[in-house]
């Protein structure tokens, strides 16, 4: 049940937990009381998919509190800048009071090969057919300034069960703010009987200014209200 306090400042490194907590003994990573710690990707090389600032892969019983997760940029298609990526068989994961912002892919919305721009503030993707991502709580977080292209700011997809998304604020993002979806192209080999997010609660979230108005080459008006 260890707690790691991060002092005020910017941390220019990927956060990739390698150990899990236990029932009743959560591992916690949080800003020191009264201070703000930033997981800052300004100087990091972002390439491909899953190369998020915070990567939670096959981890159990861990929580993140009051962190700023920000500044992940790229300008290539087939690259997905991500603030938070939760995948594999992770369970009992909490993000509380975090701010995720300035996650951007700045390439053209679609290139000459037909590849589309993509990025995510938070991507939750259950990729194991036998063990879902489970008991996920995302609350009191703020997501903004996301250039997600044709992806969504906050995505739950694949084998994900028993989640709660509550009291968050999502604004000033491209395309859709929050989506609860099937695995589709994100997990194309998943068993269709479990390859979708289910049995969850989404409540009391504020979602606004989700628009492609700045992508004038394809859309000149808002395409989503949330």
Kindly label every feature range from the protein language model.
Residues 11-17, 41-44, 48-52, 73-82, ...:
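Short glycine/acidic-rich loop motifs that flank beta-strands on beta-rich extracellular proteins
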Residues 11-28, 38-65, 69-91, 121-130:
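Extracellular beta-strand-rich solenoid/capping regions of secreted or surface-exposed proteins
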Residues 7-9, 32:
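Active-site-proximal beta-strand/loop segments in catalytic clefts of secreted hydrolases
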Residues 20-22, 159-162:
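Short, surface-exposed basic-aromatic patches at helix termini and helix-loop junctions that form
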Residues 81, 92, 115-123, 135, ...:
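Hydrophobic, well-ordered secondary-structure segments
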Residues 7, 87, 157:
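Residue-level recognition of the GNAT/N-acetyltransferase active site
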Residues 26, 32-35, 60-71, 91-104, ...:
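Right-handed parallel beta-helix
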